[in-house]
């Protein structure tokens, strides 16, 4: 397996990651034996990055990935999970992010994840599912920093992209 540096984090990730989303369905609808066997084969092939989120099977993907990794105990597994803040929680973003991460860690059976991603789109003005640049810089990033300083994750990411110009505006 080939590995590449993940930005400036110091992490070396396999060029092929293991997606635990509902598209293939294994980590949401598969049997425990199939999940364990498939993850074990991925690890044997050199895969070290596992991507999950609460949105994948309403937390079931995180629960199943946590169980499998606890059983297999891979030495170099890198786990990333995500938060998608629902519009109904935009009035209390910090609490929503904190609760989501705490719940994800509990489902995964981990004290810390390697990468915690924001999964909302970002636009200049926000609206719908999208956060505004002001919400991200004023509320999301400070909350992420506080949670990182508390040791709940190592690195942050943004996966919901949105408006490229808005992402470059700050």
Regions found by a protein language model. Give the residues of each.
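Structural recognition of the beta-strand scaffold that forms the well-ordered cores
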Residues: 17, 51, 78-81, 114-117, ...
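Active-site oxyanion-binding pockets that recognize sulfate/phosphate
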Residues: 51, 87, 130
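N-terminal binding-site loop/beta-alpha segment at the start of enzyme catalytic domains
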Residues: 1-77, 143, 149
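Active-site beta-loop-alpha junctions enriched in small/polar residues
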Residues: 21-23, 53-55, 82-86, 118-121, ...
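Glycine/proline-rich, positively charged
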Residues: 27, 90-170
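Structural motif corresponding to the early beta-alpha repeats
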Residues: 71-95, 119-122
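Short, small-residue-rich loop/turn micro-motifs
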Residues: 10, 15-20, 83, 112, ...
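Context-gated lysine
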Residues: 12, 70-73, 82, 106, ...
């Amino acid at each position: 397996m080939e590995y590449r540096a993940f930005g400036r984090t110091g992490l070396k990730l396999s060029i092929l990651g293991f997606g635990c989303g509902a598209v293939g369905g294994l980590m949401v609808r598969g049997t425990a034996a199939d999940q364990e066997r498939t993850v074990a084969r991925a690890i044997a092939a050199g895969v070290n990055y596992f991507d999950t989120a609460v949105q994948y099977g309403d937390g079931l993907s995180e629960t199943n990935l946590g169980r499998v990794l606890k059983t297999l105990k891979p030495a170099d597994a890198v786990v990333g999970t995500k938060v998608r803040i629902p519009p109904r929680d935009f009035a209390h973003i910090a609490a929503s992010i904190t609760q989501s991460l705490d719940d994800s860690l509990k489902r995964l059976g981990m004290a810390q994840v390697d990468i915690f991603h924001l999964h909302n789109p970002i636009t200049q003005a926000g609206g719908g599912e999208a956060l505004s640049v002001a919400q991200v810089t004023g509320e999301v990033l400070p909350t992420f920093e506080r949670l990182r300083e508390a040791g709940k994750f190592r690195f942050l990411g943004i996966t919901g992209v949105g408006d490229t110009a808005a992402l470059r505006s700050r």
